[in-house]
């Protein structure tokens, strides 16, 4: 787990642990050790929302049964946009290792760009018709996709309201 979490904050995390807490030790507290002060742990209350969410996703991928489907709403919520690559790499790596299908939602153009063109067959977007009904569309079936891609990235298409 630490190898996936290590690049997240400005100061590298070198170890992640959890310990039982509470009167009857029925709860757990998460701790991270960072390179800048390796003797002083940072508990979950001192971690950013993005770091906690990233760790939760790693734990979910490591503990879900193989051949499962893991749905993650707003996968990058709270995570700094500069960490999109680490998130995408972790999702691809752990889902492949654990044989888990991952379905994620996002509104982040940086994350879409990090997925890259090879992932186009796996990207969908949602539109609404004149009645307000939502429709899920495969990006690879988008009319004039090649022309849109020639003028920018997947994230740029989203920002420009083309998908």
Describe each PLM feature range.
Residues 9-12, 65, 98, 119:
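Residues at helix C-cap/C′ positions in short coil/turn segments immediately following an alpha-helix
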Residues 10, 14-62, 69-81:
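Conserved ABC ATPase signature
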Residues 3-6, 14:
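Bergerat-fold GHKL/Histidine-kinase-like ATPase
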